[in-house]
Swiss-Prot record:
GO terms for cellular component: cell division site; cell septum; cytosol; plasma membrane. Homodimer. Interacts with FtsZ. Transmembrane segments: none annotated. The gene is zapA. This is Cell division protein ZapA. It holds the Pfam family ZapA.
Length: 109
């Protein structure tokens, strides 16, 4: 689907952005999140310059994204290690099973 113009309110300003209809709800939630972040920053830092608040918020979001990427990378590495260990355990069990079935006297008559 093609993007449609959508008006969103951020920090008292109306912005018109193009957005596919199926993503409008996510856009509105993102706008609400940004609005809340800016309000919290304004109170916490006592900065009144909107541009400065936007830059600080952007830096915070980038930092959070970097932290999440790191956690995802660590999680993936951990899962890969667990999968390798599981594969080794299965292979070892199959080798042991092969040894047991190859022993003389283990055949049914």
């Amino acid at each position: 689907m093609s993007a449609q113009p959508v008006d969103i309110q951020i920090f008292g300003r109306t912005l018109r952005v193009n957005c596919p209809p199926e993503q409008q709800e996510a856009l509105n939630q993102a706008a609400e999140d940004l609005n809340q972040r800016l309000q919290n920053l304004k109170v916490r830092t006592r900065v009144t310059n909107t541009e400065q608040l936007v830059f600080i918020a952007a830096l915070n979001v980038c930092h959070e994204l970097a932290q999440e990427r790191l956690k995802t990378r660590d999680y993936a590495a951990n899962m890969e290690q667990r999968i390798r260990l599981l594969q080794q355990t299965i292979e070892q069990a199959l080798v042991e099973q092969g040894r047991i079935t190859e022993r003389p006297g283990n055949q049914f008559e």
